[in-house]
Amino acid sequence: MTNRLVLSGTVCRAPLRKVSPSGIPHCQFVLEHRSVQEEAGFHRQAWCQMPVIVSGHENQAITHSITVGSRITVQGFISCHKAKNGLSKMVLHAEQIELIDSGD
């Protein structure tokens, strides 16, 4: 089964870094996406806020460059996480992160 998502946007919540009891580093943040997409011949506004988690040592170096306001593209897979309150939320598990040059 295919499960791939590529999403570009702006980091809107400060990254939270943790290390699991087994020593695996994790970085969590929220990515806000806004764009205009074409659907059925019409233009529509597309907007979402997607929680992102980066796990493992491979991508941790780039997470130290990510702050609120950073523009990035994230590639990975989606999965549901159950919160302590019992509600499920969709999360993007990042496998590749690219900083978008602001042009400054």
UniProtKB/Swiss-Prot annotation:
Q: Which GO terms describe its biological process?
A: DNA replication initiation; DNA replication, synthesis of primer; plasmid maintenance; replication fork processing; response to radiation
PTM field: An intersubunit disulfide bond is seen in some crystals.
Which cysteines bridge via disulfide bonds?
A: C48-C80
Please tell me, according to the UniProt entry, what happens when changing Q45A: Increased binding to DnaT, loads DnaB replicative helicase
Q: Known consequence of changing K82A?
A: 5-fold decrease in ssDNA-binding. Somewhat reduced PriA binding, does not stimulate PriA helicase, significantly reduced binding to DnaT and ssDNA, does not load DnaB replicative helicase
Where, by residue number, is the motif L45 loop? 82-89
Recorded phenotype for the gene knockout or disruption: Called priB302; no growth phenotype, 2-fold decrease in recombination proficiency. Inviable at 10 ng/ml ciprofloxacin. Resumption of DNA synthesis after arrest of DNA replication (upon UV treatment) is slower than wild-type, no change in survival after UV treatment. A double priB-priC deletion causes a drastic reduction in cell growth and/or viability. Strongly reduced UV resistance and greatly increased SOS induction; when associated with 'R-230', 'Y-479' or to a lesser extent 'P-557' in priA. Synthetically lethal in combination with a polA, priC, rep or lexA deletion.
Q: Which GO terms describe its molecular function?
A: identical protein binding; single-stranded DNA binding
Task: Summarize the protein's role.
Answer: Involved in the restart of stalled replication forks, which reloads the replicative helicase (DnaB) on sites other than the origin of replication; the PriA-PriB pathway is the major replication restart pathway. There are several restart pathways, the PriA-PriB pathway is subdivided into 2 distinct pathways. priB and priC have redundant roles in the cell. During primosome assembly it facilitates complex formation between PriA and DnaT on DNA; stabilizes PriA on DNA, presumably by preventing or inhibiting PriA DNA translocation activity. Genetic interactions among priB, dam, lexA, nagC, polA, rdgB, rdgB, rep and uup link the PriA-PriB replication restart pathway to DNA double-strand break repair.
Give the protein's recorded name.
Answer: Replication restart protein PriB
Name of the coding gene: priB
